[in-house]
Amino acid sequence: EESYQGGGTILSFGSLAIQSKIPASFYRPDIEALLKQKAALSVPNAAKPTVLIYHSHTTEGYTLLDAGYYTKSTDLRSDSSTQNMVRVGDELCAYLERCGIGVVHDRTTHDKDYSGAYDHSRKTVAGYLEKYPSIEITIDVHRDDITYDNKTKVKPTAKIKGKKAARMMIIAGCEYNRVKNFPDWEYNLRFDLAVQQQVEKQYPGLMRPILFSERKYNMDMTRNSFLLEVGTDGNTPVSYTHLRAHETRGN
């Protein structure tokens, strides 16, 4: 239960941070400059879906008991929609709807064939974008897995209003090296920083640095796409639902 940064170069501006795994010779994010540029978004309309929530790794789950340890038999995946990523997506969806934002939540299990999960979810996203051209934001909701070489699991935790809450991390990608056909990646990074800034205003310390690396993860499909890691498999359902930390998305 700690703050975890991982590798890469940490770039910061105020309370905002990016953990960049991209060589500075290719691109060095200027957080201040990116924040000055407006995200490519329309005004939210409750009558039409603006946001798509989905899960490439749908069966990712959490530690059910905060016992401080786990065993080889601990099951950190679940087919139950009340214990896997669908539960997180349901709560996020409900709140955004209360904020007057049109949302579609896809509850499809995409990781029955784990190695093909992103290919499966890409087809799902493409279908929704065709059906609902009004969708501008896609959020692939996951939970992270941080395990040290000695098998110790990390559960990044913040203390918000005196209670523990699972920290969240946005993953942003770019067109670099092996990643091709991702021309609008900087729009995503701009949007990601705006989201991180809003969350940090309301719940300081809740967000981990944005992980910026040579990844696509279907984020090339809209200009406002990101992958969101809500806690890790070391966190408990109580820690990610406390304060409904995801509610900051609606604001």
Regions found by a protein language model. Give the residues of each.
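N-terminal catalytic or cofactor-binding beta/alpha core of small enzyme domains
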Residues: 1-134, 145-150
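Catalytic-loop motifs flanking and including active-site residues across diverse enzymes
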Residues: 88, 191, 195, 243
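Active-site-proximal helix/loop segments of hydrolytic enzymes
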Residues: 118-126, 130-137, 143-236
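Conserved small/polar residues in nucleotide/adenosyl-binding loops
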Residues: 241-250
